From Swiss-Prot:
InterPro entries: CBFA_NFYB_domain, Histone-fold, Transcr_DNA_Rep_Reg. This is NCT transcriptional regulatory complex subunit A. The gene is nctA. Belongs to the NC2 alpha/DRAP1 family. The keyword Transcription applies. It comes from Aspergillus fumigatus (strain ATCC MYA-4609 / CBS 101355 / FGSC A1100 / Af293). Its main location: nucleus. One of its GO terms (biological process) is transcription by RNA polymerase II. Forms the NCT transcriptional regulatory complex with nctB and mot1. Keywords: DNA-binding, Nucleus, Transcription, Transcription regulation. CDD domains: HFD_DRAP1. Residues 1-12 have a biased composition (Basic and acidic residues). Disruption phenotype: Results in a reduction in growth rate. Leads to a multidrug-resistance phenotype, including the azoles (itraconazole, voriconazole and posaconazole), as well as the salvage therapeutic amphotericin B and terbinafine, an agent used in the treatment of chronic and allergic disease. Also leads to transcriptional derepression of cdr1B and its over-production. Also results in a notable increase in the immunogenic properties of Aspergillus fumigatus, but does not result in loss of virulence. Residues 13-22 have a biased composition (Polar residues).
């Protein structure tokens, strides 16, 4: 290879004969190509330094103005009309008041408290023991003597004896209450009569108690003393006759 090929470098093209058909945007001075300012003059920096297009600001919108009613002299003749008009406008724009909501407290139905049942009262008849029983054999003979009864079962006289016993206890207990109310220490026929009269269950004894005389006025004194009305006075025992003095 030759020295020219070994030291090869590209040659700059010759632009002296090239003429641009587009006129330059900015009139710049023409420098000869041999001048050192020729390369700098060919650089067009007008696009970078040209002022950019700025959009004109939009016109400001019209600010709404609040309507202020003109001042009206209260002494002028137009003031009543204006007042009525203002009152109508005020009533039209007035918001109806909301109805008051009242909270109704729920009523709780209170259940009545159930009282405990009272303890069963002991039966006074059950606590009384009768030592002398009604004779069952005699009750049986009395029942068999009745023509309407005829034969009697073995258990029947026993049940009748127990029923008579309970009836006697009930009647005597009521008569004893009458005696206590009258401050008497004994139960008499008069007390039995008062007990039968006050109890409707014992009305079947009305014919029997009708034969019992009412208690006399002085009977209360005998009851208080604990004496019996039917009790007869005791006879005094006679003593020995005094011996006559013999002469």
């Amino acid at each position: 290879m030759t020295d020219q090929d070994s030291t090869y470098r590209p040659r700059s093209p010759d632009l002296s004969t090239f003429q641009s058909s587009i006129p330059p945007a900015v009139n710049s001075p023409i420098y000869p190509l041999a001048s050192p300012l020729a390369h700098r003059a060919s650089y067009d920096a007008s696009p970078f330094f040209a002022p950019q297009y700025q959009q004109p600001p939009a016109p400001l919108g019209r600010v709404p103005q609040q309507y202020i009613p003109p001042f009206v002299d209260p002494n002028s003749p137009l003031s009543p009309d204006m007042a009525r008009r203002s009152s109508r406008l005020a009533r039209a724009t007035e918001v109806a008041p909301m109805p008051e909501v009242s909270y109704a407290q729920p009523v709780l139905s209170e259940e009545p408290q159930q009282l405990p049942p009272p303890p069963p009262q002991p039966n006074p008849v059950a606590s009384i023991e009768v030592k002398t029983k009604f004779p069952v054999a005699r009750i049986k003979r009395i029942m068999q003597a009745d023509e309407d009864v005829g034969k009697v079962a073995q258990v029947t006289p026993i049940a009748v004896s127990k029923a008579l016993e309970l009836f006697m206890i009930s009647l005597v207990t009521k008569a004893a209450k009458e005696a206590r109310d009258r401050n008497s220490k004994r139960v008499t026929a008069t007390h039995l009569k008062q007990a039968v009269v006050k109890d409707e269950v014992l009305d079947f004894l009305a014919d029997i108690i009708a034969k019992v005389p009412d208690q006399p006025a002085g009977g209360r004194k005998h009851d208080d003393d604990g004496s019996d009305q039917n009790e007869q006075p005791k006879r005094k025992r006679g003593g020995r006759r005094p011996k006559d003095d013999s002469d």
